[in-house]
Amino acid sequence: NLYNIRNLHIPEVCLKWELMDEDYQGRLCNPLNPFVSHKEIESVNNAVMMPAHGPAKNMEYDAVATTHSWVPKRNRSILNTSQRGILEDEQMYQRCCNLFEKFFPSSSYRRPVGISSMVEAMVSRARIDARIDFESGRIKKEEFTEIMKTCSTIEELRRQK
């Protein structure tokens, strides 16, 4: 039986993969198929607001799911308002989070812990990955040197701030 308590954490597609024919697998896993795309996790938090007068109100607000991820819920157009700077900041933060997820794919489903900043963690990961790739022969010495130089430049710029 595919459906038991030990298999609850495994997606149904994975459980039934061997039972499907190839055509059905192709349709089911096609990212362009709107009927099988997965719903994004909405990042809405609740807060109890205490107004100056009257009872406390429970309100929803948009926020990032963690400090290292970005999934905005709202769909507002603020391009032609005084809020444009906020939108640009949000877009920059989104790019940073996407870059962080490239370095640490598990951050999309597991909250990162530790005291390092995003930049420190990414530089450290880049150095480790570059060393592994160089020692295994996947990259040349010039590429390895360039990566290390870029990491040093980033660290130097951080120290200057």
From Swiss-Prot:
Enzyme superclass (EC): transferase
Database matches in InterPro entries: RNA_pol_PB1_influenza
Keyword Coiled coil: no
UniProt key word rRNA-binding: no
Gene Ontology CC annotation, any one: host cell nucleus
Keyword vocabulary terms for this entry: Eukaryotic host gene expression shutoff by virus, Eukaryotic host transcription shutoff by virus, Host cytoplasm, Host gene expression shutoff by virus, Host nucleus, Host-virus interaction, Inhibition of host RNA polymerase II by virus, Nucleotide-binding, Nucleotidyltransferase, Phosphoprotein, RNA-directed RNA polymerase, Transferase, Viral RNA replication, Viral transcription
Molecular function via GO: nucleotide binding; RNA binding; RNA-directed RNA polymerase activity
EC number: 2.7.7.48
Cited Pfam families: Flu_PB1 (PF00602)
Cell location: Host nucleus; Host cytoplasm
Reactions that this protein is recorded to catalyse: RNA(n) + a ribonucleoside 5'-triphosphate = RNA(n+1) + diphosphate
PTM characteristics: Phosphorylated by host PRKCA.
GO biological process, one term: symbiont-mediated suppression of host mRNA transcription via inhibition of RNA polymerase II activity
Function, as annotated: RNA-dependent RNA polymerase which is responsible for replication and transcription of virus RNA segments. The transcription of viral mRNAs occurs by a unique mechanism called cap-snatching. 5' methylated caps of cellular mRNAs are cleaved after 10-13 nucleotides by PA. In turn, these short capped RNAs are used as primers by PB1 for transcription of viral mRNAs. During virus replication, PB1 initiates RNA synthesis and copy vRNA into complementary RNA (cRNA) which in turn serves as a template for the production of more vRNAs.
Family (UniProt): Belongs to the influenza viruses polymerase PB1 family.
Subunit architecture: Influenza RNA polymerase is composed of three subunits: PB1, PB2 and PA. Interacts (via N-terminus) with PA (via C-terminus). Interacts (via C-terminus) with PB2 (via N-terminus); this interaction is essential for transcription initiation. Interacts (via C-terminus) with human PKP2 (via N-terminus); the interaction competitively inhibits the interaction between the RNA polymerase subunits PB1 and PB2.
Protein name stated in the entry: RNA-directed RNA polymerase catalytic subunit
